[in-house]
């Protein structure tokens, strides 16, 4: 597997993370030797020790921004805390989603007792009907959607798509098991259909406008 580097300078490196790869292991994780993390993968390919600025869920693919020094991390993180970074995701969801929709609904934070304001803009790009029965219907409908999270809550996009009854395919926690099982059985797809496709921001050190696009992984259908 090759490392897909989207951008690199003296301050950061941006890569296209594959599906089913942790950004980094939890401290004292027992799986460090058994399972390659993104940080380890980058080190193997470049000999760079890098520091994550943000995270993608293990089963989400796409753009990840990493700093080359710990002292650079806070400047890049400010882009996210100030919502000064434009994020675009692509997902496949159950059913025919609305042409456009703004989802304004609180999402639980890392403290599961506290809800935080969350806003997502959604647009449907394509729809398809598969002549494959998925209970309780004789065929199955799906939509390719473009998602713009305007806040950065944990699992925000996954929760918001469930809120409008169009869960992401492959979402074992919030999704529809019948449809997930069909994709495994018919297509061998056992990942989450969520891809961080674009990241746009003004570089905090050079003031350069950075516009990154991560191609879909080969295993996207």
Language model regions located:
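RNA pseudouridine synthases
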Residues: 1-221
């Amino acid at each position: 597997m090759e490392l897909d580097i989207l951008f690199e300078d003296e301050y950061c490196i941006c890569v296209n993370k594959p599906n089913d790869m942790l950004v980094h292991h939890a401290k004292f994780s027992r799986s460090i030797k058994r399972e390659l993390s993104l940080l380890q993968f980058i080190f193997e390919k470049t000999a760079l020790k890098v520091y994550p600025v943000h995270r993608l869920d293990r089963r989400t693919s796409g753009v990840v921004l990493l700093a080359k020094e710990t002292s650079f991390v806070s400047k890049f993180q400010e882009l996210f805390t100030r919502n000064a970074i434009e994020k675009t995701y692509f997902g496949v969801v159950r059913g025919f989603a609305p042409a456009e929709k703004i989802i304004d609904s609180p999402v639980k934070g890392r403290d599961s007792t506290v809800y935080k304001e969350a806003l997502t803009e959604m647009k449907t790009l394509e729809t398809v009907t598969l002549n494959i029965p998925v209970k309780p219907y004789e065929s199955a409908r799906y939509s390719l959607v473009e998602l713009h999270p305007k806040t950065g809550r944990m699992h925000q996009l996954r929760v918001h798509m469930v809120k409008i009854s169009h869960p992401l395919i492959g979402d074992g926690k919030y999704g529809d098991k019948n449809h997930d099982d069909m994709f495994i059985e018919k297509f061998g797809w056992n990942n989450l259909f969520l891809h961080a496709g674009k990241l746009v921001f003004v570089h905090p050190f050079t003031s350069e406008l950075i516009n990154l696009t991560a191609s879909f992984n080969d295993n996207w259908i």
